[in-house]
Amino acid sequence: MKGIRWSVIILLILIFAVTALPKKLVYGYVTPGPDTWYRKDVEGFLYAAELAGVEVVVLNSDYDVEKEISNIKTLVDMGVDGMCIFSFNPNGPFIAAREAAKAGIPLVVTDNVGQVLEAEDPVVAAIDFDWDAMGRDIAQYIANQWPEENIAFIAGRLEHVPVQVFLKAFEEEVKKLGKNKIVAIRDGKYIPDEAVKQVQDLIESGYDFTVLHIFNEEMAAAVVRWLKSRNLLNNPIKITSQNGAPYGIELIKEGSIKYSISSSPGWEGFISFLALHGYVTDKIKKERQWILLPITPVTKETINDKTKVVPWDVDPVWIDLTKKYFPQYMGLLDVLK
């Protein structure tokens, strides 16, 4: 009888010990599609989550509005402790903000250029690069390097808010500088073959341009190959691009892409996690934060410097850069001490 009593006591102690353990946090991430930029953003988020011991549920919307709404509601129904959304359309973040607020789930929004901060429902933070500054920087470079030459522009997805902000700034700066003219704007949809198709159509339709800006280097790499095959690359068509992707860096080194801007989606995902985690763990209580990651031109002087041309893939330099640019996150992870 005494043995049974002790067994019951031990069992109760074990049950209490298990229930007293801190609950493992679970975050949700809604990603817009399968493209490299989005995958790297997710990888950065997951890397930080692994360091923090947080579980993450990732749901892909595959550029489908209804699927995106379903993904948001799925995470809400799961009762996740926090949520991040990277949307391909302007309405997605506002829907996520509304649904998350109703459920009391903290929300971080990636690459919405801060628009969601104006929503009635509060969000923790909007994480962005300065797309306006990027557009103006590219316009200034083209004006300085190739005055009087016409420009064709291959966008990512024209419904994507960062594309719209970049393009508006680019058009305004080109007009302000008065040295170049934009003769065509086409939607490459972030699909390399589609970008090639659009460039081919522009050339065969007789558009007069010698400068081609392509919204990411994945599309630019495909266009480079196509132009090379027709002896048109730098003869006379010059390419500028953006993002500082690994394959883009190599094309810049060989002169196939003349200019680009570094913006690492991997590090962006890492910072998105820290913004969410800081709020969920009560380290940072502020809401409606607009957090901008730094951008830098990719030049011969910066191309081999990871602190300037920030890697897309998981890299220890993210830790150093976070300590430098975002000291508010010190102590959130063991590596940030």
Residue positions per predicted region:
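Extracytoplasmic "Venus flytrap"
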Residues: 25-44, 48, 52, 56-69, ...
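Periplasmic-binding protein-like
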Residues: 28-29, 79-87, 106-110, 152-153, ...
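Structural motif
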Residues: 57-79, 184-206, 220-222
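Hydrophobic alpha-helical segments within soluble ligand-binding/sensing domains
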Residues: 68, 125-151, 194-196, 243-248, ...
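Hydrophobic alpha-helical
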Residues: 85-102, 170, 188-251
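Flexible loop/hinge segments that line or gate small-molecule binding clefts
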Residues: 91-133, 144, 156, 245-253, ...
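Hinge/cleft segment of the Venus flytrap/periplasmic-binding protein
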Residues: 158, 173-174, 271-337
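Flexible loop/turn connectors
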Residues: 235-299
